[in-house]
C-alpha cells in the first residue's frame, strides 16, 4: 500500500502504569483550565526552543483537542534528541514558576518589538490584527503575540503531565508555495494519571489504525501507479462495502426515498451556474475538453439532483420529494493532508436531497434524524454530539425563511429528544445546518452526518413548484449525508471495531478447517450448503496442521471457525470456535445454518445457537 505507513505499536501501553480507576479525560473545548494549560505549554515550548536554538523563528502555537503544537522556522531539522533537550528546558521553565502576563500595546509598539526580535512571521500576523494588540510575556525576556488565555505562572503546569510527542512538516499559512516549517506536537494534562490514560488511548488508536488493519486483512490499497488518494477495494473490503450499501439502500427505500444515478462529469457551465467555479475551484480537478466543450469532474452531487428536479414541472402535491444517491465525487486534496481512507481524492458520498414546502421542514428533519439514528446504530454508534449552526452575518435569503428554517431544525431536535449545542452565526451563508459527531469505542469523536438547508441552489437554478393558488414558489432544499463518505465511514467503523466486524458485516463469516484430506469432500459439500444459504464461507485448503489453521483464521479475524474431523463428518456436524463466545462445541450443520441465517437477517454481532 502506498503512502505513509501507520506508526508501529510500541510497548509503552504495557509499561505505562494504568490508573486504579477509570480516568475520564476532559476535552480542551469543555475545560477552561485544560485550555489554559495547553496554550501556556505551547509558549513554554517555544521559549525553550529559542533558548536552545537562537536562530529558530516562531510562528503560531495553538492548543488542540489532545495537546498543543508550535511551528518553527529553524535552519536545521529538529531530531528526537532535540525533543528530549527541549523537554528538559521546558521542565526548567516550569520549575521557575515564571509569570505569564497579558500586556496591551499599540500597533507601532508591537511592530518595534517584533522587528527588534527579528520575527518576520509575527510581523505578518500583526498586519491582520486590530488594536489594541495583546501579547503575553513569559518571565522577563520572552513574549509572544497572543490573546490568551493562560495560567498565572508556570508553576501551575504539571511537569509530570506533559510529553513532546512528534515532529512533522508544515507550511506557513498552510500554503505549499510558502516557507516550509517544522511542527512540534505535544500533549499536556492536569495530572500524570490523565497523561498515562492518554498514552494508553494513543497506543490503542495505533492498534486500531484502519490503514494497518486494511493491509493485514487485505481490504483495500492505494496504489502509486494510479495516483494518490484513489482507493482500490480488494474483494474482502468490497464485500463489506456492498453490505453497507445494501443496508443503506434498504433503509432509504423504507424511509420513502427514491434512488438516483448521475454522471461523474458535467459541462463547465453547470459549475458556473451552481457557483462551484467561483467558490470551490481550488478543490476541483482541472477541466477536460471533449468535442469542443469543457467538462469537469464533479466535486459534489447537488447540482445533478437540482437538474433532475428542474427536468419537469413540479406541483406542491408532489412535495416532499426525497432523492438519494451513492455518488462518487472527486476533489483535489493537497498531498500533505491525505490520510488512508479518511482523506482521499475520489470518494462516494451518501448524498440525499429533500425538496419540500416550508411547513414541511420540521417533519422532514425529524425523519432524517430518525433515519440517521437507524443507520448509525446498526454499526454500533449510539453516542452523538450535535451542533446546530445558525445564520452568519453574511448570508442570502429572506429573514422569514431563515427564521422558519432554523425553527424547524430546533423543533425537530426537540421532538427527537437529542441534546444539542447552538453555534450562533456558524451556519453557511446559504442556510442553517445540523452537524452530528459520533463517538467510537475509545472515546474519540468523529464528524459524520450533516443536515444542511440550502436557499442558494434553488435560487441559482430558479427551481419552483406550482403552489395551491397557482403561483410559482421556491421549494425548500435540504442537503443530507449520513455517512459523509463511504470511504471515511469505512475507516472510522474499522477502527471502532478494530477489524473485528460483527458477524453480519464480516467479509468471511465462517471458515471451514478440514483436519485431514479424508474429510475434504465433506468440507466442500458443507461449503456449498453455507453459500446457498447466504453465508459467506470458505474452506482452508492449505493442508496445515490444525493449530496453524486456527491461528491463521484468528489472525484474519474470522468470526466463526468450523473444525471438521472424522467424527464431525460422520455426525453431519462441525466443532465451532467463535471469536465472540469462544468454544461452542460440536454443532449440527442444520443448527449452524439456521443460526447464521438468523444473524444475517437480524444484523447480529454473533451466532445464537439453540442448546
From Swiss-Prot:
Residues 209-502 are annotated as: Catalytic. GO terms for cellular component: cytoplasm. GO terms for biological process: threonyl-tRNA aminoacylation. SUPFAM superfamilies: Class II aaRS ABD-related (SSF52954), Class II aaRS and biotin synthetases (SSF55681), ThrRS/AlaRS common domain (SSF55186). Residues 1-27 are annotated as: Disordered. Its main location: cytoplasm. Zn(2+) binds at residues 302, 353, 479. PROSITE patterns: AA_TRNA_LIGASE_II. It is found in: Cytoplasm. Its cofactor is Zn(2+). Its EC number is 6.1.1.3. Binds 1 zinc ion per subunit. Keywords: Aminoacyl-tRNA synthetase, ATP-binding, Cytoplasm, Ligase, Metal-binding, Nucleotide-binding, Protein biosynthesis, RNA-binding, tRNA-binding, Zinc. It catalyses: tRNA(Thr) + L-threonine + ATP = L-threonyl-tRNA(Thr) + AMP + diphosphate + H(+). Residues 8-24 have a biased composition (Low complexity). It comes from the Bacteria. InterPro entries: aa-tRNA-synt_IIb, aa-tRNA-synth_II, aa-tRNA-synth_II/BPL/LPL, Anticodon-bd, Anticodon-bd_dom_sf, Thr-tRNA-ligase_IIa, Thr/Ala-tRNA-synth_IIc_edit, ThrRS_anticodon. One of its GO terms (molecular function) is threonine-tRNA ligase activity. Catalyzes the attachment of threonine to tRNA(Thr) in a two-step reaction: L-threonine is first activated by ATP to form Thr-AMP and then transferred to the acceptor end of tRNA(Thr). Also edits incorrectly charged L-seryl-tRNA(Thr). Homodimer. Belongs to the class-II aminoacyl-tRNA synthetase family. NCBIfam families: thrS. This is Threonine--tRNA ligase. It comes from Synechococcus sp. (strain CC9605). The lineage of its organism: Bacteria, Bacillati, Cyanobacteriota, Cyanophyceae, Synechococcales.
Amino acid at each position: 500500500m502506498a503512502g505513509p505507513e501507520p506508526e508501529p505499536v510500541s510497548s509503552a501501553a504495557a509499561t505505562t502504569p494504568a490508573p486504579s480507576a477509570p480516568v475520564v479525560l476532559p476535552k480542551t473545548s469543555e475545560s477552561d483550565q485544560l485550555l489554559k494549560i495547553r496554550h501556556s505549554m505551547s509558549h513554554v515550548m517555544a521559549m525553550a526552543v529559542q533558548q536552545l536554538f537562537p536562530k529558530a523563528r516562531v510562528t503560531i502555537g495553538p492548543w488542540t483537542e489532545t495537546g498543543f503544537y508550535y511551528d518553527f522556522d529553524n535552519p536545521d531539522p529538529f531530531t528526537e534528541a532535540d525533543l528530549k533537550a527541549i523537554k528538559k528546558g521546558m521542565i526548567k521553565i516550569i520549575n521557575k514558576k515564571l509569570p505569564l502576563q497579558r500586556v496591551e500595546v499599540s500597533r507601532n509598539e508591537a511592530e518595534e518589538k517584533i522587528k527588534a526580535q527579528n520575527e518576520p512571521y509575527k510581523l505578518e500576523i500583526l498586519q491582520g490584527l486590530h488594536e489594541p494588540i495583546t501579547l503575553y510575556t513569559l518571565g522577563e525576556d520572552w513574549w509572544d503575540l497572543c490573546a490568551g488565555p493562560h495560567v498565572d505562572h508556570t508553576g501551575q503546569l504539571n511537569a509530570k503531565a506533559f510529553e513532546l510527542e512528534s515532529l512533522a512538516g508544515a507550511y506557513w499559512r498552510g500554503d505549499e508555495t510558502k516557507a516550509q516549517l517544522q511542527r512540534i506536537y505535544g500533549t499536556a494534562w492536569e495530572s500524570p494519571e490523565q497523561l498515562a490514560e492518554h498514552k494508553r488511548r494513543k497506543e490503542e488508536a495505533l492498534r486500531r489504525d484502519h490503514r494497518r488493519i486494511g493491509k493485514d486483512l487485505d481490504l483495500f490499497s492505494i496504489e502509486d501507479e494510479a495516483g494518490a488518494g484513489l482507493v482500490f477495494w480488494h474483494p474482502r473490503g468490497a464485500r463489506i462495502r456492498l453490505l453497507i450499501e445494501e443496508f443503506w439502500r434498504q433503509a432509504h427505500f423504507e424511509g420513502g426515498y427514491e434512488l438516483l444515478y448521475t454522471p461523474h462529469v458535467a459541462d463547465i457551465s453547470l459549475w458556473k451556474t451552481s457557483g462551484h467555479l467561483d467558490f470551490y475551484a481550488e478543490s476541483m480537478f482541472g477541466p477536460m475538453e471533449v468535442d469542443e466543450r469543457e467538462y469537469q469532474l464533479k466535486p459534489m452531487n447537488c447540482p445533478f439532483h437540482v437538474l433532475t428536479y428542474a427536468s419537469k414541472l413540479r406541483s406542491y402535491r408532489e412535495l416532499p420529494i426525497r432523492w438519494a444517491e451513492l455518488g462518487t465525487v472527486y476533489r483535489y486534496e493537497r498531498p500533505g493532508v491525505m490520510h488512508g481512507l479518511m482523506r482521499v481524492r475520489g470518494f462516494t458520498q451518501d448524498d440525499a436531497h429533500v425538496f419540500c414546502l416550508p411547513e414541511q421542514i420540521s417533519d422532514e428533519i425529524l425523519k432524517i434524524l430518525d433515519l440517521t439514528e437507524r443507520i448509525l446504530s446498526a454499526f454500533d454508534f449510539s453516542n452523538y454530539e450535535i451542533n446546530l449552526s445558525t445564520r452568519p452575518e453574511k448570508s442570502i435569503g429572506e429573514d422569514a425563511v431563515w427564521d422558519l428554517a432554523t425553527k424547524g431544525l430546533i423543533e425537530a431536535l426537540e421532538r427527537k429528544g437529542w441534546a444539542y449545542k447552538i453555534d450562533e452565526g456558524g451556519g453557511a451563508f446559504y442556510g442553517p445546518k445540523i452537524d452530528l459527531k459520533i463517538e467510537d469505542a475509545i472515546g474519540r469523536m468523529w464528524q459524520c452526518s450533516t443536515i444542511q438547508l440550502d436557499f442558494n441552489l434553488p435560487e441559482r437554478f430558479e427551481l419552483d413548484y406550482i403552489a395551491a393558488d397557482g403561483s410559482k414558489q421556491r421549494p425548500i432544499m435540504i442537503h443530507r449525508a449520513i455517512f459523509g463518505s463511504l470511504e471515511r465511514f469505512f475507516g472510522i467503523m474499522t477502527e471502532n471495531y478494530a477489524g473485528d466486524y460483527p458477524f453480519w458485516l464480516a467479509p468471511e463469516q465462517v471458515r471451514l478447517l478440514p483436519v485431514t484430506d479424508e474429510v475434504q469432500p465433506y468440507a466442500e459439500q458443507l461449503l456449498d450448503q453455507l453459500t446457498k444459504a447466504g453465508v459467506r464461507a470458505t474452506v482452508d485448503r492449505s493442508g496445515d496442521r490444525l493449530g496453524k489453521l486456527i491461528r491463521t483464521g484468528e489472525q484474519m479475524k474470522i468470526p466463526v471457525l468450523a473444525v471438521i474431523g472424522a467424527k464431525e463428518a460422520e455426525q453431519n456436524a462441525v466443532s465451532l470456535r467463535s471469536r465472540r463466545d469462544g468454544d461452542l462445541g460440536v454443532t449440527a450443520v442444520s443448527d449452524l445454518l439456521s443460526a447464521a441465517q438468523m444473524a444475517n437477517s437480524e444484523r447480529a454481532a454473533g451466532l445464537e445457537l439453540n442448546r
